């Protein structure tokens, strides 16, 4: 009997195979390095260690989960990120797994465009081509 984790990993292996077969993905490392070289760092550790006192909250953006099912389909990533920031979150965790969590790399990009808070990409990364 397959576990949900083994199902997720099987799906990620398929995604990696498709990415590796796609000619546009072959220069991923160079593109990633160029993006990183021009990016402003968003330092999670600094946010967690800040002297502002109180509890540090990493808020999570998630549409669904394998165990709970659909949480909410009508969520706007940018609206939620804005609310989290106003509510005092020091960072936002963004689920990007599509099949099992209803997330998307587009959610991560939209949230990045909305807030300067540090972001965590939460996904099942099994190969560097996924980054």
PLM feature segments, named:
Residues 60-64, 73-75, 100-102, 121-131:
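Glycine-rich beta-to-alpha transition loops that act as phosphate-gripper elements at the mouths
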Residues 44, 67-71, 91, 97, ...:
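Glycine-rich, flexible loop/turn motifs
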Residues 39-54, 102-126:
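Alpha-helix-loop-beta-strand connector modules within alpha/beta enzyme cores
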Residues 72-95, 114, 128-131:
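Alpha/beta enzyme core
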Residues 2-72:
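An N-cap/entry alpha-helix motif that binds or orients negatively charged groups
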Residues 6, 78-82, 109:
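Alpha-helical segments flanking ligand/cofactor-binding loops in enzyme cores
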Residues 56-60, 91, 118-120:
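Structural preference for beta-strand elements that scaffold enzyme active sites
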Residues 8, 59, 84, 92, ...:
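Conserved, mostly hydrophobic/aromatic
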